[in-house]
């Protein structure tokens, strides 16, 4: 569960290391985002030669959450950290590589490009 002011790690090679959620997209009263949801973020920490700079505002798709998600078969998938992948306005990933595992639920959310770049799909 990601809400405003939640800090996340970045799971791609855009150069950003740490980001902060500043808005959850999908309705004016929407409070929380989970895996596959799009959020608006501010870059809090970045590499000097990266594609994004500290303080810049972008959109991102959440790919891992500590809270975990329940599946139809009764299993629960949870991770050690909250992580997101930066995307452009069309929803395409800004980076060319993705680090760490992602979940199958991204497929039903229409994030096929992220799944194809990921090294492991749980």
UniProtKB/Swiss-Prot annotation:
A family per Pfam: Ribosomal_L14
InterPro entries: Ribosomal_uL14, Ribosomal_uL14_bac-type, Ribosomal_uL14_CS, Ribosomal_uL14_sf
GO process terms (BP): translation
Gene3D superfamilies, sorted: Ribosomal protein L14
GO cellular component, one term: cytosolic large ribosomal subunit
Top-level taxon in the UniProt lineage: Bacteria
UniProt keywords, alphabetically: Ribonucleoprotein, Ribosomal protein, RNA-binding, rRNA-binding
Assembly information from the UniProt record: Part of the 50S ribosomal subunit. Forms a cluster with proteins L3 and L19. In the 70S ribosome, L14 and L19 interact and together make contacts with the 16S rRNA in bridges B5 and B8.
Family to which this protein belongs: Belongs to the universal ribosomal protein uL14 family.
Name listed for the protein in its UniProt record: Large ribosomal subunit protein uL14
Species the sequence originates in: Pelagibacter ubique (strain HTCC1062)
Lineage: Bacteria, Pseudomonadati, Pseudomonadota, Alphaproteobacteria, Candidatus Pelagibacterales
